[in-house]
Amino acid sequence: VWHRLDPWPDSVAGIGRLREHFIVTPLSNGNIGLLTAMAKRAGLPWDCVLSAEVFRHYKPDPRTYLGVCEVFDIAPAQLMLVAAHVDDLDAAKACGCRTAYVHRPFEFGAGPEQQREKDKARDEARRFDLAVDDLNALASRLASSRSPRWSGVIRG
């Protein structure tokens, strides 16, 4: 099933827009084979594929996020983790990375309990550098900021 996941409707276009200014790669606890198969099937235009397996440490271990910084020879403040999972974003932020929360209403299902959890996460998202509804909105926000602090690599 994981190999056949459909992307979120904004993913392909949003990643394409982000790639105009940033290096975009996933950072997943899934393996590289899985991520490559997902990208090929869904047409995800990542610049490269990174997995926590490369670092032999898995999120939320700080060595995973800092390993990405080593791969690209950048400081943590030049890395932005983009995710719908607040625990992942909290871990990246604790390492000094920039963070962008993407609200995905049905990430964990459509039941009432899942919706309450997602609404709580959205309320908590104010602690991150950016909070957006989709990747196109993220691309627009980053393009409008034109700030050097947003230079670097985008992850999700």
Where are these regions (language model features)?
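Asp-based, Mg2+/Mn2+-dependent phosphohydrolase catalytic module
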Residues: 16, 30-156
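Short, acidic loop-to-helix structural element flanking the phosphoryl-transfer center
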Residues: 1-25, 62
